[in-house]
């Protein structure tokens, strides 16, 4: 399952919509909730990012992300 994670690069400042970034993770999970939990754990272990939202991408959404040219799965 591919998850899109919206985050701020630091927890020191209050979040601003204009500074929100995203990354994509390929998580092997049985349920959507389990995948979200695993994604959060991976990011918290490897970065100091302030996670705003974790979204499971549908097939259509994944196709769109690939078409925009910004899609790249992040590996830690």
Swiss-Prot record:
<dbReference type="GO" id="GO:0003899">
    <property type="term" value="F:DNA-directed RNA polymerase activity"/>
</dbReference>
<dbReference type="GO" id="GO:0006351">
    <property type="term" value="P:DNA-templated transcription"/>
</dbReference>
<keyword id="KW-0808">Transferase</keyword>
<comment type="similarity">
    <text>Belongs to the RNA polymerase subunit epsilon family.</text>
</comment>
<keyword id="KW-0240">DNA-directed RNA polymerase</keyword>
<dbReference type="GO" id="GO:0000428">
    <property type="term" value="C:DNA-directed RNA polymerase complex"/>
</dbReference>
<keyword id="KW-0804">Transcription</keyword>
<dbReference type="Pfam" id="PF07288">
    <property type="entry name" value="RpoY"/>
</dbReference>
<comment type="function">
    <text>A non-essential component of RNA polymerase (RNAP).</text>
</comment>
<comment type="subunit">
    <text>RNAP is composed of a core of 2 alpha, a beta and a beta' subunit. The core is associated with a delta subunit, and at least one of epsilon or omega. When a sigma factor is associated with the core the holoenzyme is formed, which can initiate transcription.</text>
</comment>
<protein>
    <recommendedName>
        <fullName>DNA-directed RNA polymerase subunit epsilon</fullName>
        <ecNumber>2.7.7.6</ecNumber>
    </recommendedName>
</protein>
<keyword id="KW-0548">Nucleotidyltransferase</keyword>
<dbReference type="GO" id="GO:0003677">
    <property type="term" value="F:DNA binding"/>
</dbReference>
<dbReference type="InterPro" id="IPR009907">
    <property type="entry name" value="RpoY"/>
</dbReference>
């Amino acid at each position: 399952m591919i998850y899109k994670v919206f985050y701020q690069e630091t927890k020191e400042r209050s979040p601003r919509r204009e500074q929100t970034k995203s990354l994509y993770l390929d998580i092997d999970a049985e349920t959507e909730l389990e995948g979200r939990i695993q994604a959060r754990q991976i990011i918290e272990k490897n970065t100091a990012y302030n996670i705003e939202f974790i979204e499971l991408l549908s097939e259509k959404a994944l196709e769109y992300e690939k078409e925009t040219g910004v899609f790249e799965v992040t590996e830690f």
